[in-house]
Structures are given as structure tokens and as C-alpha cells.
């Protein structure tokens, strides 16, 4: 006998979370829980405002229709909305025992605000020291100075930078001007520095700073090809689609010798623990980009190891099905 349940949830967010110039006061999403006999599987569906093509309401409609059809014995195709396809495919993978339990809970800590806050945490990190810095939110010159300071202060640090296409070519050059050329090889990559891929490629050629594709992966004309200066791709499964599509993209990138970073779209702790399992499975050599739980006021259903945030159980969820 099949049982499918759909829950809606809301978590308060840290006051400082701004996405695409809008403040995110709460994180809202859905869970699907599939049960068949003794087996069960969970998945998270949480479109990210300003980034996902679908709204939460659209995702909810598609999810409920799929869940009802599956419960009634059908094998419905995955919905087209990326977050819904991803969440359902994770629940199916858990149900079928296809999503390994081993997880990569290492985090590339997210440095936002004062770089002094990061020094102690990084200095205490065992093994590979990798951190992420969001750039493009302030003046490009300030960003360059902060990045230079971090690389100078911690000699074995590798930085991942994310500009979210914020810079014109001129601003990107202003940033690079303040990063000592001797340190630039320790910038693991800079995600999407400019508004167009062509400008980003030119930036890499002119500065020697490696770049990574993120938003580009979700554009219709994107193709996986080896390009000078491109070192990595960043895959956000909630924005990508089904687990199968994520696997295909990882395989295509690895075939070209590119690093692949599995990255958060600010999922709940349940979704983040699944992403940690996907990272351990598909990208075991690469620290994932999952350091977003601290932006939230609580965890849901499944806790992240060593997080001090309170954990809310199923009783805190709103049942829809």
C-alpha cells in the first residue's frame, strides 16, 4: 500500500538575508513523504525567491497532483518545475534505497560582513581550508581589499568567490586590481563575475583568475565544453531539476576535468542533509557549498550534525495531504 503526505513549512530567517535586493524574512517550502510497505522517503521542495522559475504556489499545485496520482498507484512523470522534480526524485531515491547514507558535512564557511569573524574559524579548520565570499554587494574595490586581506592573513586558504553577475567589466577589473597577483591562484574560482559569459571569459583571460559557471547552467544555450579559465561548475539541485539531471551534469563536468560543487539554495536542515549525501556520493573530492543553515532560526525533522539550532519535528509542519 502506498501513502504520500505533503507538508508545508515556514522558518524565520536571519534579519540580514537579502536576495536579489529583497529581504528574505522567512524561508517557506514543502516536504513530500512517500511510504510503501516498510520503506519511506522524504524530499524537500523549496523554490528560492528571485532565483527559481516557479513560485511556491505553483510548486505546491504540481506536487499535490503528483503525490495524489502516485498514492493511487500511478507512475506519474516528474513535474517540470525544477524544485518539485528534485524533491520528488530525492524521496523516490530514499524510498528505493538509492541515495547513500554517507554524507559530506564539511562546509566551506560563508564569509559575510567583517572578515575578522572568519579568521578564528578558518585557522581552526582541519585539512583543506576553503571559504566562500560573496562579492558584488559592495564596492568592487572594497571586495578586492577584503579578498586580498584574507589570502594574505591565511597562507593556506583557498577562496571561492561569487559575484552573481553583479559587475560590469570595469568593476571586475577594479576588483582584480586590489588582489595581489601572487595570491590569485588561491582564488579557487570566481562564480559568474560579469553579466555575460563573454565578459566573464575576458575577465579571466586578463587577470588569470579562474571562473566558474553557476547561473549559466540553467540557460537554454549552455553547453558543457572545456574553456580556458573555467575551472568549476556550481550545481544548485533545487534550481536544476531531478536527481538524474544533477547526476548527468556532474558527469558531463567531470568528463571535462572540471570541479563540481554541490551548493545550497538555502534549504532547510532536511534538504541540506540530503545535499550533503549527494555531495559525498557524486563529488567526493570537493567540499560542498552548504553553509547556509546559520541563516535560519530552526532546523526541521532531520538535524545537521553539531548545529545548535532547535529542531522542529513533524508537528511543526502544516499537513496538506
Curated annotation (Swiss-Prot):
Pathway: Quinol/quinone metabolism; 1,4-dihydroxy-2-naphthoate biosynthesis; 1,4-dihydroxy-2-naphthoate from chorismate: step 4/7; Quinol/quinone metabolism; menaquinone biosynthesis. The active site is at 134 (proton donor), 236 (proton acceptor). GO terms for biological process: menaquinone biosynthetic process. Its cofactor is a divalent metal cation. It catalyses: (1R,6R)-6-hydroxy-2-succinyl-cyclohexa-2,4-diene-1-carboxylate = 2-succinylbenzoate + H2O. The keyword Membrane does not apply. Keywords: Lyase, Magnesium, Menaquinone biosynthesis, Metal-binding. The keyword Protease does not apply. InterPro entries: Enolase-like_C_sf (IPR036849), Enolase-like_N (IPR029017), Enolase_C-like (IPR029065), Mandelate_racemase_C (IPR013342), OSB_synthase_MenC1 (IPR010196), OSBS_N (IPR041338). Signal peptide: none annotated. Pfam families: MenC_N, MR_MLE_C. GO terms for molecular function: magnesium ion binding; O-succinylbenzoate synthase activity. Belongs to the mandelate racemase/muconate lactonizing enzyme family. MenC type 1 subfamily. Converts 2-succinyl-6-hydroxy-2,4-cyclohexadiene-1-carboxylate (SHCHC) to 2-succinylbenzoate (OSB). This is o-succinylbenzoate synthase. It comes from Klebsiella pneumoniae subsp. pneumoniae (strain ATCC 700721 / MGH 78578).
Amino acid at each position: 500500500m502506498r501513502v504520500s503526505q505533503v507538508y508545508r513549512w515556514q522558518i524565520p530567517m536571519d534579519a540580514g538575508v537579502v536576495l536579489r535586493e529583497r529581504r528574505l524574512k522567512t524561508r517557506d517550502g514543502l516536504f513530500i513523504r512517500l511510504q510503501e510497505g516498510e520503506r519511506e522517503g522524504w524530499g524537500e521542495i523549496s523554490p528560492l525567491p528571485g532565483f527559481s522559475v516557479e513560485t511556491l504556489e505553483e510548486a505546491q499545485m504540481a506536487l499535490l497532483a503528483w503525490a495524489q496520482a502516485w498514492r493511487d498507484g500511478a507512475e506519474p512523470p516528474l513535474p517540470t518545475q525544477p524544485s518539485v522534480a528534485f524533491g520528488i526524485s530525492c524521496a523516490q531515491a530514499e524510498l528505493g534505497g538509492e541515495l547513500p547514507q554517507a554524507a559530506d558535512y564539511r562546509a566551506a564557511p560563508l564569509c559575510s560582513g567583517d572578515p575578522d569573524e572568519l579568521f578564528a574559524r578558518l585557522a581552526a579548520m582541519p585539512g583543506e581550508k576553503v571559504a566562500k565570499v560573496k562579492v558584488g554587494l559592495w564596492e568592487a574595490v572594497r571586495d578586492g581589499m577584503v579578498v586580498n586581506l584574507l589570502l594574505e592573513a591565511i597562507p593556506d586558504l583557498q577562496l571561492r568567490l561569487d559575484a552573481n553577475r553583479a559587475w560590469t567589466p570595469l568593476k571586475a577589473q577594479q576588483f582584480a586590481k586590489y588582489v595581489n597577483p601572487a595570491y590569485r591562484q588561491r582564488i579557487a574560482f570566481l562564480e559568474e563575475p560579469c553579466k555575460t559569459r563573454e565578459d566573464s571569459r575576458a575577465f579571466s583571460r586578463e587577470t588569470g583568475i579562474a571562473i566558474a559557471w553557476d547561473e549559466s547552467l540553467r540557460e537554454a544555450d549552455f553547453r558543457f565544453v572545456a574553456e580556458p579559465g573555467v575551472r568549476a561548475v556550481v550545481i544548485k539541485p533545487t534550481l536544476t531539476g531531478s536527481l538524474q539531471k544533477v547526476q548527468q551534469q556532474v558527469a558531463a563536468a567531470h568528463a571535462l576535468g572540471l570541479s563540481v560543487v554541490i551548493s545550497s539554495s538555502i534549504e532547510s536542515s532536511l534538504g541540506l542533509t540530503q545535499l550533503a549525501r549527494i555531495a559525498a556520493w557524486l563529488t567526493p573530492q570537493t567540499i560542498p557549498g552548504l553553509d547556509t543553515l546559520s541563516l535560519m532560526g530552526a532546523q526541521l525533522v532531520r538535524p545537521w550534525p553539531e548545529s545548535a539550532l532547535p529542531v522542529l519535528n513533524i508537528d511543526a509542519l502544516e499537513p496538506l495531504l
